[in-house]
């Protein structure tokens, strides 16, 4: 196995009223607010074909996560037995990549308004992908 490192460059940041990961919803459908994805101008051409109403998968880097954690109580509830992080949606994990299903509300230049996003303000954006139908 090749363990060579590699670099990911954020393409933008989240603007959200959420500021504390501890009090943010665990999933967007659990009360995640509308938020803005603010993209770097260098990637704006990549938005071609994205429209209001489109469902997207947003990939983020959960920069406040603890990358040393390998076992957690699911949903941070100590009444739940400990599990390995790869069997949970915990942000704490060796490579804290966030996966967020969102819907585009509006697009204003480099700013995309999306619904139901549980990511906190300032979270780096790695990528956006369309949700595709069944093949």
Describe the function of each predicted region:
Residues 1-101, 105-135:
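Glycine-rich, low-complexity intrinsically disordered segments
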